[in-house]
Amino acid sequence: MDRQDVISQLALRERINFEVKKAENSIPKSVWETYSAFANTIGGYILLGIAEKKEEEGDSPYLITGVNDPTKLKKEHFDSLNSDKVSTNILTDDDVEVIEYEEKLLVSIHVPQANYRQRPVYIKGNLNKGTYKRNHEGDYHCTEEEVKAMIRDSNDAGNDGVLIEHYDMEDIDMLTLRAFRNRFRSTNPEHLFNDYDDKEFLRNLGGYTKDRATGREGLTLAGLLMFGKGLAIRERFDNIRLDYLDQTNLQPGERWSDRLTYDGSWENNLYNFFTRVLARLVQDIRRPFVLKGYEREDDTPIHKAIREALTNLVIHADYMMTGVLRVEKHDDRFFFSNPGTLKLPIAEIYKGGNSKARNPHIQSMLRMLGYGDNIGSGFPTIVDACKKENWQKPLLCESNELHTVELTISMKSVIAEECIQHLRKILGEQVVRQLDSEEIFILSVAWMDGSVTNSVIQTLLDKNALQVGKLLYSL
């Protein structure tokens, strides 16, 4: 962080990834709450040496007080990080800098997002009362459920291999399992699993297990959710709903043109939901005539992208939380939402090369049918497909307040000519000429979507919070 970064950050005021503290002579206790909150959310910057003014004290909300001995503060900070004050130290020397600003010395602390194995990051040795998260510009205690979710996610083995006691083969919908096995046999005709009976087949897929310590056996979370009877699933997972809405070609007064949710006419397990929704999503996507050898190639990049998005929805959802797996089809976009938060940082997901499914057994089941992968190339597949169509970059967002992950695949052009015309109309030709391509892009997104945020622009332009802060400040 440099002087210009300080100017742009202060202009945008405190928010989800930026906090100021007075700290003239020592580290304030509240720094550790913010440290925990940033680490458990998306990371951020803490600036020491700046106090918040009362509203009546002038236009600027900040008073630059400076720190008297930055070297002492840095040592105090790292001594505390390496003590029992915090559960883990995720900072390096490069994360703490001294900055000169308005003839005062400030200390900048960059707190990165902790990786999923390190979370929850908590303070004072108190897991339940010392774990914080960041919402808007404040630090808040995590609820017991939020702490439990972070602990679950820290397990590399995932969540879906656990034995669900008192649920067995009687709770499997055999029509669903037969449909899966038929597709499996078609995709893998020589596979050894084809000769197994249903229980052994499920056991090898991770859908059935035995606790060797107790001798108890039964369905796993993956087995019940993927192939279970609807009633059995609703009895055990009444916290989860499945919902698909087609909102294309709506007439006045219509809320949807097609909907798939539980209505008693189908067994509402994940495999049935996945196959029914996928068919509806791609049914009217054009398939250009392309030959691969002597056969027609019907699998377009957009078909692959939609499959990947739906696969991600199912394998990354947190089925222990209360929420909805929601899929929406609109005239100009596809929308996917699932309960839970992201295990990996958003920037890392866009880059690809790393895959950490919350439900690896469900992921394996779908992959054996040709859906998705486990090498981290899935999301770049979605990005590349949109780029080939000249669509906007797909927007992946998470809400730590609502505990949801949302993906929007927009069919709008990157920057439509009507956006440029609108900007010329409201800003004037002269102003638009002075804007660079990134500034025009930000204003275009704001016009199309109604507003923009730092985190959204980070994703769309592949920039960090400080870089986007400078752009927003310039506008």
Can you name each region flagged by the protein language model?
Residues 1-302, 311-423, 430, 444-447, ...:
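Conserved N-terminal catalytic/coupling substructures associated with nucleotide/phosphate chemistry
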Residues 307-308:
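Conserved polar catalytic motif of the HATPase_c/GHKL fold
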Residues 474-475:
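Alpha-helical DNA-recognition elements
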Residues 432-440:
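Short helix-coil-helix linker/hinge
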